[in-house]
């Protein structure tokens, strides 16, 4: 029997909720090797925007190269729009709303996305994985964030939590 006088105990924390939305957004990515999602949240825990990595609007992703290796123009790298950038670009409100906002992402942002995050006015980055920590791109990202007072931290407590979503009537 459920005690209706007490709140439910196994609900998602705000961090878990927003990271789950970022992960759900990543499922829209058509990239066969890397799916990344992003969720931007204001200081009142309201979702401002979401994004995922993929081809630019209007670019046919059936002809889009998804390879990771080979001639650079035949790989995904010069064409793909990262999740963080898509989330920033997808927002249709005032950029002023990003002041003091947080961005939740699967993967620590690259240096190009770090610049976008800083320019947007986002003040905190929460990520799940930093698997490219030793790359120049991520080292540069951390230098940029440190110099511009953007805090960042790994969301550790969520690592072993499973959120199951079933779409059925």
Regions found by a protein language model. Give the residues of each.
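Zinc-dependent deaminase catalytic domain
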Residues: 1-169
């Amino acid at each position: 029997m459920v005690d209706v006088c007490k709140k439910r105990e196994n609900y998602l924390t705000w961090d878990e909720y927003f990271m789950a939305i970022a992960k759900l957004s990543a499922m829209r990515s058509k990239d066969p090797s890397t799916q990344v999602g992003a969720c931007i949240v204001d200081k009142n825990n309201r979702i401002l925007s979401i994004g995922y990595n993929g081809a630019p609007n209007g670019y046919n992703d059936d002809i889009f190269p998804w390879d990771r290796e080979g001639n650079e123009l035949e790989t995904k790298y010069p064409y793909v729009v990262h999740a963080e950038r898509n989330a920033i670009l997808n927002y249709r409100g005032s950029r002023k709303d990003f002041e003091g906002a947080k961005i939740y992402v699967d993967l620590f942002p690259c240096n190009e996305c770090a610049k976008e995050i800083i320019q947007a006015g986002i003040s905190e980055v929460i990520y799940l994985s930093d698997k490219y920590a030793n790359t120049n791109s991520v080292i540069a990202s951390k230098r940029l964030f440190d110099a511009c007072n953007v805090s960042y931290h790994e969301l550790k407590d969520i690592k072993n939590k499973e959120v199951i979503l079933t779409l059925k009537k």
